[in-house]
């Protein structure tokens, strides 16, 4: 049997972390078994579904490289198929027309609730022989079995059973002729030959209804697996304040897709004590029986730790392709300065996100208008004039511009003046970067370049002279 899974989001908003994890688990299961992964857009909610949301979902999937083998399919383009199946069910007696008014249904609901009963349709039209005009408004209901129970072996939670007496005859076609969500899902899974349905636990109550419809259609019933919800680290339902933002927001905030995927796969699944997984390892090791039944806690600090790891572990040339977007957002012209891959090597240890990296690299490519006030006050003082002049001349004398030779020039300056490295290094750092912090000074000066570094040292010396004149 060929394994076939699907990810079926409703395009009423962005792709959030919960949806992304469900997509990842479905994708991994299919890939682990050499199967196929289908993308289906469940857009039957015409009022809330938007083209922007569809684009956002597909952007998120593409950024995470969760490529699909079929689709995207759109439910709104399959209404003829759904209605044909409903008409077939009406002929076979597994569905029936219901003419009950909204007023009657509301009164029935209030009566049942007053008695402490679960609100459900009482089946009045199921056995009715009343004659109705062809154009009289009606819905179509599924004739749910009235005896027995529905049992399915959830691959994460184990056997789950529902009594058919708890399930009423759900509406499968509205008065306007449009099919309902639960019915469309069934026909889609049937037509697309889905073998395994991996989805959130909020769909558990839909499962017995969908199984009963499949059985009425004499269609194969897929295997179900319901993934637990994601909470914040405070144990409460995940919300925006916990980080429940769109997948693309993580891109915008400077996270690598590898970091988010690694974090999401571990958010409810484990393989021994292993924390870091390549995409190939995820595919190799992923199984549904290793997915936890318990809710997971989203921890932004852990995600940030993973992102920092991947910034330094992945090839700099690859990280640079993602950094490029953030550089563009900062409007930095990188034509005159180090290659982005070299920048990744320079700033990788200091920066935990690509956004942070982009925001802290401008001095490598563009001259700064002024020095950081605190750093200049502390380090660009008259006592720094001589160390800066000496190191400038030694840097100017370098014929082979390497980080090693830059280091020798700084060290030689300290030795010649008989001062500690800090007496040379700190004024030099402020002079060439404009700030009091940077990566290792020798590689920083090397990356900034010989001509630009000397020009900036001269600018710092002029700043010191002007400061002296003002005193």
Curated annotation (Swiss-Prot):
UniProt cross-references to CDD domains, sorted A to Z: GluRS_core (cd00808)
- What protein does this entry describe? Glutamate--tRNA ligase
Is this entry keyworded ATP-binding?
A: yes
**Enzyme Commission number(s) from the entry:** 6.1.1.17
Q: Which family does it belong to?
A: Belongs to the class-I aminoacyl-tRNA synthetase family. Glutamate--tRNA ligase type 1 subfamily.
Catalytic activity, as annotated: tRNA(Glu) + L-glutamate + ATP = L-glutamyl-tRNA(Glu) + AMP + diphosphate
Annotated residues that bind ATP are located at 240
Group of enzyme by EC: ligase
Cofactors, names only = Zn(2+)
The record, for SUPFAM superfamilies, names: An anticodon-binding domain of class I aminoacyl-tRNA synthetases, Nucleotidylyl transferase
Keywords from UniProt, A to Z, are: Aminoacyl-tRNA synthetase, ATP-binding, Cytoplasm, Ligase, Metal-binding, Nucleotide-binding, Protein biosynthesis, Zinc
Spell out the subunit comment: Monomer.
Per the UniProt record, the lineage of the source organism begins with: Bacteria, Pseudomonadati, Pseudomonadota, Gammaproteobacteria, Enterobacterales
Which residues does the annotation say bind Zn(2+)?
A: 98, 100, 125, 127
Q: Motif 'KMSKS' region: where?
A: 237-241
Compartments (UniProt record): Cytoplasm
């Amino acid at each position: 049997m060929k394994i076939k899974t699907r990810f079926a989001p409703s395009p009423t908003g962005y792709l959030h972390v919960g949806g992304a994890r469900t997509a990842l688990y479905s994708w991994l299961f299919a890939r682990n078994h050499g199967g196929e992964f289908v993308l289906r857009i469940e857009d039957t909610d015409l009022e809330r579904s938007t083209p922007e949301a569809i684009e956002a979902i597909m952007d998120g999937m593409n950024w995470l490289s969760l490529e699909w083998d079929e689709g995207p399919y759109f439910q709104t383009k399959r209404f003829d198929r759904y209605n044909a199946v409903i008409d077939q069910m009406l002929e076979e007696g597994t569905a029936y027309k219901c003419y009950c008014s909204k007023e009657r249904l509301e009164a029935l609901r209030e009566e049942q609730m007053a008695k402490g009963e679960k609100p459900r349709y009482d089946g009045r039209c199921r056995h009715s022989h009343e004659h109705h005009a062809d154009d009289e408004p009606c819905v179509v209901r599924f004739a749910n079995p009235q005896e027995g129970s529905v049992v399915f072996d959830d691959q994460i939670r184990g056997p789950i059973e529902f009594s058919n007496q708890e399930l009423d005859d759900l509406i499968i076609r509205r008065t306007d002729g449009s099919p309902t969500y639960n019915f469309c899902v069934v026909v889609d899974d049937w037509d697309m030959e889905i073998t395994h349905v991996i989805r959130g636990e909020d769909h558990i109550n839909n499962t017995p209804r969908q199984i009963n419809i499949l059985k009425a259609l004499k269609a194969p019933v897929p295997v179900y697996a319901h993934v637990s919800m994601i909470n914040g680290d405070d144990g409460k339902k995940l919300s925006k304040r916990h980080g429940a933002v769109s997948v693309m927001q993580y891109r915008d905030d400077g996270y690598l897709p590898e970091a988010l995927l690694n974090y999401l796969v571990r958010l409810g699944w484990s393989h021994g004590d292993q924390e870091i997984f390549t995409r190939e390892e995820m595919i190799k090791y992923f199984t549904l029986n290793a997915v936890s039944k318990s809710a997971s806690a989203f921890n932004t600090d852990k995600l940030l730790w993973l992102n920092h790891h991947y910034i330094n572990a992945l090839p700099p040339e690859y990280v640079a392709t993602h950094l490029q977007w953030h550089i563009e957002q900062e409007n930095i012209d990188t034509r005159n300065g180090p290659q982005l891959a070299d920048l990744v090597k320079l700033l990788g240890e200091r920066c935990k996100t690509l956004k942070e990296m982009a925001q802290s690299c401008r001095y490598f490519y563009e001259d700064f208008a002024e020095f950081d006030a605190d750093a200049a006050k502390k380090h660009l003082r008259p006592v720094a004039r001589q160390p800066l002049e000496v190191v400038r001349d030694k840097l100017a004398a370098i014929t082979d511009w390497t980080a090693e030779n830059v280091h020798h020039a700084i060290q030689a300056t300290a030795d010649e003046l008989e001062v500690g490295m800090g007496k040379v290094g700190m004024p030099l750092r402020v002079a060439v970067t404009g700030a009091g912090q940077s990566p290792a000074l020798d590689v920083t000066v090397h990356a900034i370049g010989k001509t630009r570094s000397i020009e900036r040292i001269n600018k710092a010396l002029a700043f010191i002279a002007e400061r002296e004149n003002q005193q």
